[in-house]
């Protein structure tokens, strides 16, 4: 007899304006069997997280499966804070983003530790996310035209070392809990293509917690999804399936 392996589910990262109850209710009414809230849906009103019991009760209320919990923004901020970019501000409380880069990095690391602890309590093994700008904006944006190595500098090797050092605590926690941190290969992150991701894995001595979320809609810079996901296939633990069209003739990067 045939056995159902997959079920319909909804990613919650695009539903940040909803409460956890509103999001799970929305997913139920949309016809999904499960849902994946983001870290923000799980926050309480006191700067912490809801209890695992409260979260479970919300899903049980609607007879929905908890398929995972994403944590894109805090992890991106953690590996981007060193750049002192203002673009981390939308994802942080004002009393945090006004602090120094070192203080912001320390705060987000503690936040991520608490998030991973809660995820483990809920039995979560897969966390969709993306690493931040560990190698800097020059490398991630392609400027200045690939001159990533020059007199007394090597942005790639420096970035690899930075990634290893800054993520070591988070990776250790994930491994302790048996959680896979599934990076979405994506512009303006630590890995823009499959080769970049494999470089990170090598730099981290093949750390088993480093995974990939396969999302074909992110293949908009020339690397098609078959090329990308064959290269990182052994590291794929999550996937996102969407209706999408990559339109030709449009500039990917624009200031207007």
Report residues per predicted region.
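Gly/Pro-rich active-site loop or hairpin
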Residues: 11-18, 24, 45-48, 194-198, ...
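Active-site acidic/histidine proton-transfer and metal-coordination neighborhood
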Residues: 17, 22, 80-212
């Amino acid at each position: 007899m045939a056995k159902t392996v997959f079920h319909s589910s909804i990613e919650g990262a695009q539903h940040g304006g909803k409460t956890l109850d509103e999001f799970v209710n929305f997913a139920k009414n949309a016809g999904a069997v499960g849902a994946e809230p983001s870290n923000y849906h799980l926050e309480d009103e006191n700067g912490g997280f809801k209890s695992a019991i409260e979260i479970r009760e919300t899903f049980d209320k609607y007879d929905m499966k908890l398929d995972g919990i994403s944590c894109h923004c805090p992890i991106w901020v953690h590996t981007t804070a060193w750049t002192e970019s203002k673009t981390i501000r939308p994802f942080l409380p004002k009393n945090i983003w006004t602090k120094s880069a070192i203080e912001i990095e320390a705060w987000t690391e503690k936040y991520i530790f608490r998030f991973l602890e809660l995820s483990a309590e809920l039995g979560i093994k897969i966390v969709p996310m993306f690493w931040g700008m560990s190698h800097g904006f020059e490398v991630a944006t392609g400027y200045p035209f690939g001159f990533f190595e020059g007199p007394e500098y090597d942005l790639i090797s420096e970035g690899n070392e930075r990634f290893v050092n800054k993520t070591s605590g988070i990776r250790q926690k994930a491994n302790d809990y048996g959680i896979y941190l599934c990076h979405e290969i994506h512009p303006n992150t630590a890995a823009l293509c499959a080769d970049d991701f494999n470089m990170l894995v090598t730099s981290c001595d093949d750390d088993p917690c480093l995974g990939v979320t396969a999302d074909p809609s992110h293949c908009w810079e020339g690397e098609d999804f078959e090329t990308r996901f064959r290269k990182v296939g052994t590291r794929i633990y999550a996937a996102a399936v969407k209706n999408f069209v990559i339109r030709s003739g449009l500039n990917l990067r624009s200031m207007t």
